[in-house]
UniProtKB/Swiss-Prot annotation:
Domain of life: Eukaryota
Any one Gene Ontology molecular-function term assigned to this protein's record: structural molecule activity
Chain positions covered by the region annotation Linker 12: 204-219
Similarity comment: family membership: Belongs to the intermediate filament family.
Protein name: Keratin, type I cuticular Ha3-II
Native organism: Mus musculus
Region feature (Linker 1): 92-102
Location of the region described as Coil 1B in the Swiss-Prot/TrEMBL record: 103-203
Site, Stutter: residue positions: A305
Gene from which this protein is expressed: Krt33b
């Protein structure tokens, strides 16, 4: 009778489903007693010659015990798995359904706080703008005050210069008045001298007349005196007019010089005021450009800092992703190695199963039909979830051979 016992399908997934995290060093001995397998077990060439060596029964007994322990372990793991599933279901039924807490109130509070923060930021920005405007206005007023102060100093210096010119003109006027007074005194002196000379001449002429009366009178002294007087008066009047004309011309020239100097001074002052206004406007514009440059530099620095922080964050994210990729690749390599080890274990187990099946078939073919052999439940197929009834076999017959 051929051996029809159904063996359980052994694969790396079945043998390792209960231990997914077993280190690779333990994958070579997945079943108890696997490290004590004889050297000839697992070699597919030893039974192909059609003869058995002296350790045939020991090898079959060893494989039978190993298969029994494996099936016992599978049944134990299935029972533990069922118990764990029952416990998980009971735990899920006992636990209350997870209710998500209501965070709407907190969300509203957070939104209100965010609105307040935004309002505060806008208010701070407005205050900063007002402070900047006030600083600019203060700077403008300071520059205007400095310009007006410089203009005042210039006007005061001009007034001091005009006062000096006025003092000089006053001195010139006093000198001219002194000259006029001296000329008048000289005129009076000349008149007095003239009168004295006239009187002396009259006295002399009178004496001579008395002397000459006795002689014969020749000239009219009164007429001569009148002519001389007229000549002197004309000379004095001419000198007076010349002096007055010279004084008038000098005064007019000085007045013209003063007027022209005052006009030039006013034009220079107006030009200076216009230039100072232009300078003030240019200074204000320069300060505005400086403030704009400072604000643009601050904005540029803030933008650079923000983009550098964002770049560092992106770089950190890239580094994290690269590290995660490295870990995933290492994990994939490790899982690939584990998979290869499991494939090797599967191949070795399949080879052992084939060896075991070949031994059983060859033994069944060599042994004569045993009338004591009892048929077991192996006649009907066994599914993958049914335990194998052929694990334990009884010895019977005079040859003490294994039955079905």
């Amino acid at each position: 009778m051929p051996y029809n016992c159904c063996l359980p399908a052994m694969s790396c997934r079945t043998s390792c489903s209960s231990r997914p995290c077993v280190p690779p060093s333990c994958h070579g001995c997945t079943l108890p007693g696997a490290c004590n397998i004889p050297a000839n077990v697992g070699n597919c060439n030893w039974f192909c010659e059609g003869s058995f060596n002296g350790n045939e029964r020991e090898t079959m007994q060893f494989l039978n015990d190993r298969l029994a322990s494996y099936m016992e372990k599978v049944r134990q793991l299935e029972r533990e798995n069922a118990e764990l599933e029952c416990k998980i279901q009971e735990r899920n039924q006992q636990q209350d359904p997870l209710v998500c807490p209501a965070y709407q109130a907190y969300f509203r509070t957070i939104e209100e706080l965010q609105q307040k923060i935004l309002c505060g930021k806008s208010e701070n920005g407005r205050l900063v703008v007002q402070i900047d405007n006030a600083k600019l206005a203060a700077d403008d007023f300071r520059t205007k005050y400095e310009s007006e102060l410089s203009l005042r100093q210039l006007v005061e210096s001009d007034l001091n210069g005009l006062r000096r010119i006025l003092d000089e003109l006053t001195l010139c006027k006093s000198d001219l008045e002194a000259q006029v007074e001296s000329l008048r005194q000289e005129l009076l002196c000349l008149k007095q001298n003239h009168e004295e000379e006239v009187n002396t001449l009259r006295c002399q002429l009178g004496d001579r007349l008395n002397v000459e009366v006795d002689a014969a009178p020749t000239v009219d002294l009164n007429r001569v005196l009148n002519e001389t007087r007229c000549q002197y008066e004309a000379l004095v009047e001419t000198n007076r007019r010349e002096v007055e004309e010279w004084f008038t011309t000098q005064t007019e020239e000085l007045n013209k010089q003063v007027v022209s100097s005052s006009e030039q001074l006013q034009s220079c002052q107006a030009e200076i005021i216009e230039l100072r206004r232009t300078v003030n406007a240019l200074e204000i514009e320069l300060q505005a450009q400086h403030s704009m440059r400072n604000s643009l530099e601050n904005t540029l620095a803030e933008s650079e800092a923000r983009y550098s922080s964002q770049l560092s964050q992106v770089q950190c994210l890239i580094t994290n992703v690269e590290s995660q990729l490295g870990e995933i690749r290492a994990d994939l390599e490790r899982q690939n190695q584990e998979y290869q080890v499991l494939l090797d274990v599967k191949a070795r187990l399949e080879c052992e199963i084939n060896t075991y099946r070949g031994l059983l078939e060859s033994e069944d073919c060599k042994l004569p039909c045993n009338p004591c052999a009892t048929t077991n439940a192996c006649d009907k197929p066994i599914g993958p979830c049914v335990t194998n009834p052929c694990v334990t076999r009884s010895r019977c017959g005079p040859c003490n051979s294994f039955g079905c």
